[in-house]
């Protein structure tokens, strides 16, 4: 995976948080791209081919597949975990289960407000 990071809900949009990898999009609107759609729908999205995803935001030309997992606090999405791969179809059920477990722990630790 060439990019792993967080987008945090701030001021009505997702804003880039801690990440590892090349510089990424700074902000994403609700419902736009894989991250914004995961936020809007409050569910994990596993995308085998990002180029086939309607409205995909190409922050990096390296991105071929992606998984985005919402971090929930008190029933609301407060952040998303985003992992991008330079290979098609890189993410599977084990990846989803592991990242969702991490997101659940992070949600319980996330500051209120």
Region roles according to the model:
Residues 65-72:
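A short, aliphatic-rich beta-strand micro-motif
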Residues 1-15, 113:
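Helix-loop-beta substructure at the N-terminus of cytosolic sensory domains
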Residues 72-85:
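Sensory-domain boundary capping and coupling elements
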Residues 50-51, 84-86:
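Anionic group-transfer/hydrolysis microenvironments
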Residues 9-61:
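Regulatory sensory and allosteric helical modules in signal-transduction proteins
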Residues 3, 68, 80:
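Short hydrophobic/aromatic beta-strand element in the GNAT-like acyltransferase core
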Residues 47-48, 73, 106, 110:
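Hydrophobic, well-ordered secondary-structure segments
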Residues 85-113:
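Juxtadomain coupling helices with adjacent low-complexity linkers
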